[in-house]
Regions:
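Beta-rich carbohydrate-recognition and catalytic domains
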Residues: 2-268, 272-368, 382-430, 452-501, ...
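Extracellular Ig-like/FN3 beta-sandwich strand-entry sites
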Residues: 59-63, 578, 609-611
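Short tryptophan-centered beta-strand motifs in secreted/extracellular beta-sheet-rich domains
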Residues: 378, 520-522, 577-594
């Protein structure tokens, strides 16, 4: 790539140019000139840094030339304007690799590509993972997320940021949090601003409804380690405040590892403030973090009897470090168990409030093979307490890797502290790659986002795409002792477009889908077999043809892939009586919902460029089928 190049841009109403640059040699610098070639500013990259975030004031409503010398700008945008929460940042394509874009592409030019979804949230470009800090604040929903502006893969973590009025259409805001400064200097260390959550607070830091709030209090993990040396890991929890929905205060530490026996994995704080019941002190807020704890800390009788705080319902899987890992390839640590560590703090939630360790609210001995939880959650819903956690480095007996598990029960007041008495447990999604779920409360609803990681190997680096996608927002409920999930009502109101016409041939009923993005709703009258061809495509890694189906055979309903690395995985939904099937297929991702959310299954799948096709054959009676265009969200 060239390390000396220039681009011309229009500043419009923006006052700040933000560039995320990597050094290519000595004397790395950015120069700004006006339309007459006169130099406006020159900024050298600090000598010690290999990466740098330039913040350069620029005049409004002029044309300027931005010149890069001995560096490459990996990510860039204009920020700071009137009504930034409505206008958003203006993306600038300064990475020479993304040469198919205009210098200042529109949202339509960025997202209207078959390699990108139309209705699911993605950043402009680069890597994205976990949803963070979900909340509603002063009339807008805030979505923060793990982000690497420097490349297509995971690296030192920043927090990206977007807002929405309706949970569907999003506005991109400036990057919110950055890695620790030393990570820009020494490439031997990695880490950054890891995942966390949000609480909306009033002017006195008391938790309150988001539309009445004065600020967002955020909690997150700071991570630091020497690359390749897990024994060097340091993780601790911090807090910071956002008062205007855009900018952030200085962070303050709030929770360190409790003792030397505590797992090095100690991250992803999720704070809840509105819980109640015998085990809850209403004057305190509660935080769960992901970790693993020594088995020796747990009473053997308590484990064998599934006492409060213990889950023993397993799924007969194995420990592995990768999605294709075979049994016995990697060795688990049987001296530890995945656990959710519980902390509490007295309200109001000042930055220096003391968080008291309450012990493990839940430990999963049924999945002890897993290394640790990630992205834990604990909340109350429909009269029950629900815990959610992703099981790291675990593959279940059906072959699914790092699934997210839910636990439903009651929070008990024990002598050791609050403990979840688990009554039922299962997977949150029967597909693959739906990970890092985070929920938040919204006027009586419990809404959740997940992140799609690429376990099916659908993503190949190429210009002008992103690597990372959020799920549709789902609303959770507890029904008959099980956690259910279904897209929020706004998804149906905003995304469903024109109805498509049905056609028939000797192979069944089919619908031609413009731009390969559609919603399908089918009501079934009986338990007979069916086959639904959701999408076809070309495998991006080897060029072979692929298919994605939903099948029912002998009472078992499952997703089936052909031509992918997941062909040997059994995506069994676990549901026997299926009467309603909903499918959201969005160019390269599918989300399936059975029986109004009784089960959900999803995965990445790269569909055909151009128009797609939905096709089905049913042995029994189909009461009705409705197929609609899935409208795009970027405008």
């Amino acid at each position: 790539m060239p390390d000396n190049y220039s681009v011309a841009i229009e500043t419009g109403g923006y006052r700040l140019l933000e560039l995320f640059a990597e050094r290519c040699g000595d004397d790395a610098a950015i120069t700004i000139t006006d339309g007459d070639g006169h130099q406006i500013a020159s900024h050298a990259m600090p000598v010690a840094e290999r990466r740098h975030h330039f913040l350069i004031p620029v005049p409004t409503n002029v044309r300027i030339t931005v010149s890069a010398h001995r560096l490459t700008v990996r990510f860039a945008y204009l920020s700071e304007c009137e009504n930034l929460l409505d206008e958003g940042v203006r993306f600038i394509s300064m990475n020479p690799y993304d040469n198919e874009w205009d210098t200042q592409p529109t949202l339509e030019q960025i997202y209207d590509r078959f390699a990108r979804p139309a209705a699911h949230f993605e950043p402009f470009a680069r890597w994205m993972n976990d949803p963070n800090g979900l909340c509603r604040f002063q009339g807008r929903y805030h979505l923060f997320y793990q982000f690497n502006p420097y490349g297509f893969g995971w690296d030192n973590m920043h927090w990206g940021h977007a807002v929405s009025r309706d949970l569907v259409h999003w506005t991109h805001l400036p990057i919110f949090l950055e890695p620790q400064p030393e990570l820009h200097i020494d490439e031997r260390i990695v880490g950054g601003a890891f995942s966390g959550s949000a609480v909306t607070v009033d002017a006195c830091d008391n938790p309150c409804k988001g539309d009445d709030a004065a600020a967002i209090r955020l909690y997150l993990t700071r991570h630091l380690e020497t690359r390749g040396d897990e024994s060097s890991v340091t993780e601790y929890q911090t807090t910071c405040l956002c008062e205007d929905g855009v900018h952030v205060s200085v962070e303050s530490p709030v929770a360190l590892r409790v003792n030397d026996g505590f797992g090095f994995d100690f991250r992803d704080p999720k704070v809840e403030t509105g819980m109640s019941g015998e085990a809850i002190n209403p004057e305190r807020a509660y935080m769960v973090t992901a970790t693993n704890l020594p088995v020796s800390e747990f009473d053997t009788d308590a484990v064998s009897s599934a006492a409060p705080g213990i889950s023993v319902q397993g799924t007969d899987g194995w420990f592995t470090c990768g999605p294709q890992g075979r049994p016995g390839t990697d060795k688990p640590n049987m001296d530890t168990v995945p656990a959710m560590a519980l902390f509490s703090a007295k309200k109001p939630l000042k930055r220096n409030v003391t968080w008291q360790y309450e012990g493990p609210v839940l430990a999963d001995f049924g999945h002890q093979l897993s290394r640790t939880y990630e992205c834990p959650d604990l909340f109350q819903l429909d009269g029950k307490t629900v815990a959610i956690g992703a099981l790291m480095h675990y593959r279940d007996k059906q072959g699914r890797f790092q699934q997210v598990r839910w636990y439903v029960g009651d929070l008990k007041d024990t002598a050791e502290g609050p403990r979840l008495q688990v009554e039922n447990s299962d997977w949150c999604d029967f597909g693959t790659g739906y990970y890092a779920m985070q929920s938040f409360a919204d006027d009586g609803r419990r809404i959740v986002f997940g992140w799609y990681t690429d376990f099916p190997a659908m993503r190949v680096e190429k210009p002008c795409i992103a690597n990372g996608m959020m799920s549709l927002p789902r609303e959770l409920h507890v029904r008959d002792g099980r956690l259910t999930s279904r897209p929020v009502k706004e998804a149906y109101e905003q995304l469903l477009g024109d109805r498509l016409e049905a056609h028939a041939d000797e192979n069944g009923t089919f619908f031609i889908v413009p731009n390969n993005a559609y919603y399908m709703d089918m009501h079934l009258a009986d338990d007979n077999d069916f086959t639904m061809l959701i999408a076809t495509g070309t495998n991006p890694t080897n060029g072979n043809s692929m298919e994605l189906q939903l099948q029912r055979r002998n009472g078992v309903t499952r997703l089936v892939t052909k031509g992918t690395v997941a062909d040997n995985v059994d995506f069994d939904s676990g549901i026997t009586d299926v009467r309603r099937v909903e499918i959201f297929f969005d160019r390269n991702v599918v989300e399936v919902f059975l029986n109004n959310g009784e089960a959900a299954g999803s995965m990445l799948f790269q569909g055909t460029d151009g128009d797609g096709e939905f096709r089905f054959v049913a042995d029994g009676k189909v009461d009705c089928v409705d197929v609609r265009v899935l409208d795009g969200i970027w405008r």
